[in-house]
């Protein structure tokens, strides 16, 4: 499915972090993040996930860094409430072009 194609872009040892994770917790593994996404998809249907801005950066300390902003629309399955919200995603890439770092920032409280 679409999620399989999404995860093909990630290295097997990729680390996933963001505001969904408590400050003192380690980043999630690929399997842990996949499970968390499946839990989310049990509660919500994704209507759209549209990129509105993307920028490639190269810093001395961190090469191959991409930051993007997305406009996401979801429908809560329990009551069909539609919510549209912004998500900022930062990705770091390895030499093979696979994503090794995924950091997503969005306000989960907007779904309440």
Which residue stretches match the model-derived regions?
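Short helix-adjacent coil turns
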Residues: 1-6
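Short beta-strand segments enriched in hydrophobic/aromatic residues
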Residues: 10, 70-74, 106
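Exposed beta-sheet edge and beta->alpha loop/turn motif
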Residues: 67-96
């Amino acid at each position: 499915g679409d999620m399989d194609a999404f995860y093909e872009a990630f290295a097997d040892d990729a680390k996933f972090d963001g505001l969904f994770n408590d400050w003192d917790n380690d980043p999630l593994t690929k399997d842990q993040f996949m499970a968390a996404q499946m839990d989310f998809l049990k509660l919500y249907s994704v209507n759209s996930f549209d990129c509105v801005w993307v920028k490639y950066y190269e810093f001395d300390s961190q090469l191959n860094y991409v930051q993007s902003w997305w406009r996401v629309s979801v429908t809560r399955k329990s009551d069909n409430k539609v919510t549209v919200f912004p998500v900022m995603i930062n990705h770091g890439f390895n030499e093979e072009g696979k994503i090794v770092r995924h950091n997503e920032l969005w306000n989960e409280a907007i779904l309440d």
